[in-house]
A protein has these predicted regions:
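Arg/Lys-rich, alpha-helical DNA-contact motif
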Residues: 85-118
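Canonical helix-turn-helix DNA-binding module
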Residues: 36-67
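N-terminal helix-turn-helix DNA-binding core of bacterial DNA-binding proteins
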Residues: 12-45
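DNA-binding alpha-helical recognition surfaces that contact promoter or target DNA
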Residues: 22, 52, 107
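Residues within the alpha-helical elements of helix-turn-helix
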Residues: 42, 80, 97
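Basic, amphipathic "hinge/linker" alpha-helix immediately C-terminal to the N-terminal HTH DNA-binding motif
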Residues: 69-87
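Residue-level signal for threonine
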Residues: 14, 73-74, 117
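C-terminal regulatory/oligomerization modules of transcriptional regulators
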Residues: 3, 8, 107-136
Length: 136
């Protein structure tokens, strides 16, 4: 379930790889540290699948693995994970504000965050923030 191909986005990984990075970011914020087993539990993937994905992300310089097996994001991995997480949170908030139930809003935001252009996302963010300010 983790592939890297010629048609990938500029950062060089597909949606599944981006989901791993975002999950590492979230788990680190929540727990302070992250290991492969934590990813497997959180994402409900098998340990071998997570191990393969983690090694690909390490080879691509998105994460580091220390001698005790703890995962950390590289500067590039951190930047990408933060960008994805920002998109996820904002899109979820927008959908919920429009009356979409929380579960559907989060699921759809997770799908869209990977394919929406930077230009389009920035316009949504501008619009959302402007409307929030107008309501205060």
């Amino acid at each position: 379930n983790f592939k890297i191909s010629k048609g990938d986005p500029p950062m060089g990984i597909q949606e599944s790889g981006e989901n791993y990075l975002e999950t590492i970011l979230i788990l680190r914020e929540r727990n302070g540290s992250v290991r492969s087993i934590d990813l497997a539990r959180e994402m409900e993937y098998s340990k071998p699948s997570v191990s393969r994905a983690v090694n690909i992300l390490k080879d691509r310089n998105y994460i580091n693995i220390d001698e005790k097996g703890y995962l950390s994001l590289t500067e590039e991995g951190q930047k990408l994970a933060e960008s994805l997480y920002e998109r996820h949170k904002l899109l979820s908030e927008c959908f919920i504000a429009l009356g979409v139930d929380v579960k559907t809003a989060r699921e759809d935001a997770c799908k869209i965050e990977h394919v929406i252009s930077e230009k389009c996302f920035e316009k949504i963010k501008e619009h959302y923030n402007k409307n929030r300010e107008d309501q205060i």
